[in-house]
From Swiss-Prot:
Role: Catalyzes the attachment of alanine to tRNA(Ala) in a two-step reaction: alanine is first activated by ATP to form Ala-AMP and then transferred to the acceptor end of tRNA(Ala). Also edits incorrectly charged Ser-tRNA(Ala) and Gly-tRNA(Ala) via its editing domain.
Protein known as: Alanine--tRNA ligase
EC annotation from Swiss-Prot or TrEMBL: 6.1.1.7
Biological processes, Gene Ontology terms: alanyl-tRNA aminoacylation; negative regulation of DNA-templated transcription
InterPro entries associated with the record: aa-tRNA-synth_II/BPL/LPL, Ala-tRNA-lgiase_IIc, Ala-tRNA-ligase_IIc_anticod-bd, Ala-tRNA-synth_IIc_core, Ala-tRNA-synth_IIc_N, Ala-tRNA_ligase, Ala_tRNA_ligase_euk/bac, DHHA1_dom
Entry keyword Coiled coil: no
Class of this enzyme: ligase
Domain notes for this protein: Consists of three domains; the N-terminal catalytic domain, the editing domain and the C-terminal C-Ala domain. The editing domain removes incorrectly charged amino acids, while the C-Ala domain, along with tRNA(Ala), serves as a bridge to cooperatively bring together the editing and aminoacylation centers thus stimulating deacylation of misacylated tRNAs.
Originating organism: Nitratidesulfovibrio vulgaris (strain DP4)
Length: 879
């Protein structure tokens, strides 16, 4: 039986033999494409090439691209595990032509690979073409053994592809395989007639031959291109002769491993099988997402990861996995796929820790969610309701990850139904909000503003690695709205592009340069430099003298102090990264950075907050390398050679075949396009000013270098002197003096709490005499004097210990505010609950509140309404 790994290998080798460059899979996090949450197709990493914004050294490529589809039109998450072919993570095999070959070779290659390499039976293969694509049909007849009766013409919905409302588009041709008559869905079964699995699409060939404008008009592209995609999981199922992708070797190893953990059997019952398939699918997605730098959070990509972990964990509970297990199945993915994706092995320990921590967190969350649901059901029962409102079900789902079916199950056992329509309406609102919020960063807007320049093939030669000034010619001039102009006059703002520039455009976390550009007739101040594409640098300018004109020769000068300050911070960012890995471990990876002239910010993967000792060790390591004054070396080389040299490739970054390597002896080797010092000693000093958490598994260090670090040290010394004066202690005695004051403060606080407790206890004994009978219910409603809210709660606890059956309400005034607490004994909770009562009672004092069925608390702003509140409580009890 041919394995999935063998199919992947044969595919890439086949296209390499036909002149294609085998390109590495890009990250699941799209680089420079804020329109996408995840990489969801093989062509994503080549999008700028298809749009004419980028050029590569090759004109044909082949990839096995890792993809994730869990959002937008591809959001079929609830179907994963329930069908044979829905997945979150999958691999897309593809071949691409960038103005090289077109339809004929695309069809020839596909037919040859399927029938000669994979040896699929020719008599079972079919093709579809776009209804108007006579050329594609003739090419299939010419280069394959598919007869005319097995070639189907389809409409635009099925066989026409576009990148968006505008841009490259074209017809496509799908290859299908007949899986046999036993798969027939009925008398109307057939291609284009039904969606059953008899005629299974295995490969889609897209012929990009038009450029569509905003009106829908299509013009032929000067260089038509090819984009094809074939799902590895699907073609593996076909080659291995199994109906479901989950029955292939891709998934079976994970499924059987999970069976061993849960002591269950696959193919025993539908519920168990679904759970096993979900766990296998999600384990793959989770392992690759974390490896590509995505970490659990409550927004964006991190929220998707958290949902997948919780969904898989919940399905594990359904088959008896009550302990954490998902980190183990994710490690099984590493065992299976680590040879083809080495990054999985490199990050396996960290990945497993992140998953384990998220499992533990979800365990605690589930307990809280169950408690909340029980409280809500008790409140509903007391009020006589028989239906769980949709907002409660939604809150449980949104806050605790409780799927609707769990709420349904628990509610049904207690005799309740659930408002599913209300739940779905709130879910729809949330999705619409999320869709509106996901507009990405400003990168997309910046790139689109300068799209005309990119389409014209405009490029800038960057000379800033070696020079801070230089000469160039203005090749594009725009006003502040990025509209083409012939000149900028003094006081006007706009954008300027030169054929050569020493200005570094913001990228890789480093801020853009500032400076001046002068011509014989005028001068502009460069307030920022941006980089809408790898080969185009745009200066954001403000004219300060005379006029600056299109096509003028100009002198460009970068502000040296800011450039050098940025270089200090960028070099120290590399040193910090290396130091963190030495002190904390190799699991540390860069998760984001900011390099500005005045500071650096570095986000990195690490589970726990750093200790003071660890921070001090990292700071010492960086300063050790600074004081060693080690020269920096830069070199350009092939990506694979750089990796062999040990260069660090960063999460989420997209690298071309040739990369720039920045090396600091044996201390640090990274792929980097930024500007740096010539030697580490130029950094002067490195000072960490803060360490904090920014997301689950991601920490952040902010630091200063050079003069900024020196100024911070001087400021700290000044503050130390002030503290010494205030505490009447020498600098070396400050800590012991503060500790002494803290101890004294704790003693005084305990004395105050003891006095308050004594007063509270005394009130508790006395106010019990104020209890009255209201409609057969013992009611205590009393206004009390206490020092704080904690004392009020303590007093209520004292009252509850003496009130065997009844309702108590205590009110305390603090200035213009009032606090209320209501307690209901257990025997009365079928008639009254504390949250029910306090809602109406608190309204009398201008407040609101909530709590558990046995006790609820509220705050108000109208102390004068306390008597009315007590009266309201009596009326509620008396009916």
């Amino acid at each position: 039986m041919i394995t999935a790994n063998e199919i992947r290998r044969r595919f890439l080798e086949f296209y390499k033999a036909h002149g294609h460059e085998a390109v590495r899979s890009s990250s699941l996090v799209p680089k420079d494409d804020p329109s996408l949450l995840f990489t969801n197709a093989g062509m994503v990493q080549f999008k700028k090439i298809f749009l004419g914004q980028e050029k590569r050294a090759y004109s044909r490529a082949t990839t096995s691209q890792k993809c994730l589809r869990v959002g937008g039109k591809h959001n079929d998450l609830e179907n994963v595990g329930r069908t044979a072919r829905h997945h979150t993570f999958f691999e897309m095999l593809g071949n691409f032509s960038f103005g090289d070959y077109f339809k004929e070779d695309a069809i020839k290659f596909a037919w040859k690979f399927l029938t000669e390499e994979l040896k699929l039976p020719k008599e079972r293969l079919y093709a579809t073409v776009f209804r108007d694509d006579d050329e594609a049909e003739q090419l299939w007849l010419k280069h394959s053994d598919i007869p005319a009766e097995r070639i189907y013409r389809m409409g635009e919905k099925d066989n026409f592809w576009s990148m968006g409302d505008t841009g490259p588009c074209g017809p496509c041709s799908e290859i299908l395989i007949d899986q046999g008559e036993h798969m027939t869905c009925g008398p109307d079964c057939g291609i284009g007639k039904c969606d059953c699995d008899r005629f299974l699409e295995i490969w889609n060939l897209v012929f990009m031959q038009y450029d569509q404008d905003a009106t829908g008009k299509r013009e032929p592209l000067p260089k038509p291109s090819i984009d094809t995609g074939m799902g590895l999981e699907r073609i593996t199922a076909v080659c291995q002769g199994v109906f479901s992708n989950f029955d292939t070797d891709i998934f079976q190893a994970i499924i059987q491993y999970t069976c061993g953990l849960a002591n269950v059997s696959y193919r025993s019952d539908d519920e168990t099988d679904t759970a096993l398939r979900v766990i296998a699918d999600h384990s793959r997605a989770i392992a690759f997402m974390i490896t590509d730098g995505i970490l659990p959070s409550n927004e964006g990509r991190g929220y998707v990861l958290r949902r997948l972990i919780r969904r898989a964990y919940r399905f594990g509970r359904l088959i008896g996995l009550t302990d954490t297990f998902l980190h183990k199945t994710a490690l099984k993915v590493v065992d299976i796929m680590g040879d083809d994706y080495p990054e999985l092995r490199e990050n396996s320990d960290f990945m497993a820790r992140v998953v384990r921590e998220e499992e533990d967190r979800f365990n605690r969350t589930l307990d809280k969610g169950l408690s909340m649901l029980e409280d809500e059901l008790a409140t509903l029962s007391a009020s006589g309701a028989a239906r769980v409102p949709g907002d409660i079900a939604f809150r449980l789902y949104d806050t605790f990850g409780f799927p609707l079916d769990i709420v349904n199950d628990i509610a049904e056992k207690r005799g309740f139904s659930v408002d599913e329509d209300g739940f779905k309406a709130l879910m729809k609102e949330q999705k619409e909000r999320a869709k509106a919020a996901w507009k990405g960063s400003g990168e997309k807007d910046i790139a689109s503003r300068f799209q005309p320049l990119l389409e014209e093939g405009m490029r800038s030669e960057f000379i800033g690695y070696d020079h801070l000034c230089g000469e160039g010619r203005i090749v594009a001039l725009m006003d502040e709205h990025a509209l083409a102009v012939e000149r900028l006059a003094a006081g006007q703002k706009g954008y300027l592009v030169t054929n050569r520039t020493p200005f570094y455009g913001a990228s890789g976390g480093q801020s853009g340069d500032i400076g001046t550009i002068a011509s014989p007739s005028g001068k502009v101040r460069v307030v920022d430099t941006i980089k809408p594409s790898p080969e185009l640098v745009v200066h954001h300018v403000e004219a300060v003298e005379g006029d600056i004109l299109l096509d003028q020769e100009v002198d460009l000068t970068v502000t040296e102090d800011d450039r050098v300050a940025s270089a200090r911070n960028h070099t120290c960012t590399h040193l910090l990264h290396a130091a963190l890995r030495r002190v904390l471990g190799d699991h540390v990876k860069q998760a984001g950075s900011l390099v500005a002239p005045d500071r650096l910010r570095f986000d990195f993967t690490h589970i726990a907050p750093m200790t003071p000792e660890e921070l001090a060790a990292v700071e010492r390591e960086v300063n050790r390398v600074i004081m060693a004054d080690i020269p920096l070396e830069t070199d350009h080389m092939h990506y694979d050679d750089a990796v062999k040299r040990g260069a660090m490739a960063l999460f989420g970054e997209k690298y071309g075949d040739e990369v720039r390597v920045v090396a600091i002896a044996d201390e640090s080797v990274e792929l980097c396009g930024g500007t740096h010092l010539r030697a580490t000693g130029q950094a002067g000093l490195f000072l960490i000013v803060s360490e904090s958490g920014v997301a689950a598994g991601v920490r952040r260090i902010e630091a200063l270098t050079g003069w900024n670090a020196m100024h911070a040290v001087l400021a700290q010394r000044s503050e130390q002197a002030q503290l010494s004066a205030m505490l009447k202690a020498r600098p070396g005695e400050i800590v012991s003096r503060v500790e002494s004051l803290q101890k004294e403060n704790r003693t005084l606080r305990k004395d105050m709490e003891r006095a308050a407790a004594q007063a509270t206890s005394g009130q508790g004994r006395n106010i019990m005499d104020e209890a009255t009978d209201v409609a057969g219910v013992k009611l205590l409603a009393a206004k009390v004097e206490v020092p704080n809210v904690k004392a009020l709660r303590d007093l209520m606890d004292d009252v509850r210990s003496k009130l065997v059956s009844g309702i108590a309400c205590l009110a305390a005034v603090d200035g213009d505010k009032v606090q209320l607490i209501i307690a209901v004994s257990k025997d009365l909770q079928t008639r009254f609950t504390a949250p029910q009562l306090i809602k109406d009672v608190a309204a009398e004092v201008g407040g609101s509140g909530g709590g558990r069925p046995d006790m609820a608390q509220a705050g108000g702003t109208n102390p004068a309404g306390i008597d009315a509140a007590f009266a309201k409580l009596r009326s509620l009890i008396g009916g």
